[in-house]
Curated annotation (Swiss-Prot):
GO terms for biological process: translation. PANTHER family: 30S RIBOSOMAL PROTEIN S13/40S RIBOSOMAL PROTEIN S18, SMALL RIBOSOMAL SUBUNIT PROTEIN US13M. This is Small ribosomal subunit protein uS13. It comes from the Bacteria. Keywords: Ribonucleoprotein, Ribosomal protein, RNA-binding, rRNA-binding, tRNA-binding. Signal peptide: none annotated.
Amino acid sequence: MARIAGIDIPSDKRVVIALTYIYGLGKKLSQKILNELNISHDIRVKNLTEQQLSSLRSEITKYSVEGDLRREVTLNIKRLMEIGVYRGLRHRKGLPVRGQKTRNNAHTVKGKPKSIAGKKK
């Protein structure tokens, strides 16, 4: 297994797919990186040379990935909550943020239904 950006990427997979194991790198961005470095998309990670791996590592450091990206996202959410905008309030209450209805199907965000004592149909 090759280690890139602090993540062990699987050696038996194609490079394009293996790079998507890094948080913040999707298929499109991994294709773009491989095109810039002139590395074939079909080559397996175990067949990469050490020079190709080092160039991949240096290219990926240019992007915000893994811990830095996760920290950036959480700080953005905290900032929204601090300034008191609508999106921040929805985050604080644990409700859908992007305008979805909550009467029926917001169970993923809201969590398990809470039973109300004394309420029967």
